[in-house]
Curated annotation (Swiss-Prot):
Keywords: Ribonucleoprotein, Ribosomal protein. GO terms for molecular function: structural constituent of ribosome. PROSITE patterns: RIBOSOMAL_L35. This is Large ribosomal subunit protein bL35. The gene is rpmI. It comes from Alkaliphilus metalliredigens (strain QYMF).
Length: 63
């Protein structure tokens, strides 16, 4: 069986943590920022963990 290829789009968006979880950045931070509050934009800068429901599918993209 040939080697599995990593999904390059997923590789750029997700990073594995030491404990095996997947880290991702939040959306809604690229444009139309004037109407968003400073607090909201500040919270969007923080990374978060991929939800349990999406974890299984994303894990298949990153062998």
């Amino acid at each position: 069986m040939p080697k599995m290829k990593t999904h390059r789009g997923a590789a750029k968006r997700f990073k594995k943590t030491k404990t095996g979880l997947l880290k991702r950045m939040k959306a809604y931070k690229s444009h139309i920022l004037t109407k968003k509050s400073s607090k909201r934009k500040r919270n969007l800068r923080k990374a978060t963990v991929v939800s349990k429901g999406d974890f299984k599918r994303i894990k298949q993209l990153l062998p």
